[in-house]
Every structure is written in C-alpha cells, then in structure tokens.
C-alpha cells in the first residue's frame, strides 16, 4: 500500500444498523435472502485511521509497527452496490473523521456517565 500499512473499509455502526433494519423490512415483505457487503466503498490505511483519530481527539497516538499477519491481505474494500440496489441503502457517515468523531463523542459521554 502507499504508506506500507493495511487498507480497510469502514462503516459507521448507525449505518450498519440502518442496513440491517432495511434488510429486515425487505425480508418481511417477502424478499429473498441475500448476502451483501457493507462499507463506504473506499479504504483507509492504518496510518490514515491514526491520523484521523489524532485530528478528532486532539491526542497524539503512539503506535508501534508490527510484522504483517500471515494471510492478511494488504487491501480489503467492500463492494456494497448490491445492498444499495436491493435495499436502497447508502451510508450517512461518509468520512473517516465523522465515523471516528461519533465514536469519540460516545466514548467521552460514557466515561462521564460512569464517574
């Protein structure tokens, strides 16, 4: 990959829940069972995820490099065209920063609530 770290596709938990809800409605209307991938359709490297998390949190993240795992593909990006076509689904959180920001906001609110 461009920066030497694995690239993965991400999807926000609310977008994932929305897709599952749409799938349930589809099946209740008599739709056939389908296997579909969910994702943004674009990948982000491990380094890009770290940089995004640093931007969102304002914290420096200290990482360490490790050897690649055996059999781990360098790039995995979901093709969610089937779920878009069948269910009319599309992600509402379309940037890595927005995905990380909502996770960070949730984490901070949970931490505050559990004090």
Language-model segment annotations:
Residues 1-115:
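C-terminal substrate-binding subdomain of Rossmann-fold SDR/epimerase-dehydratase oxidoreductases
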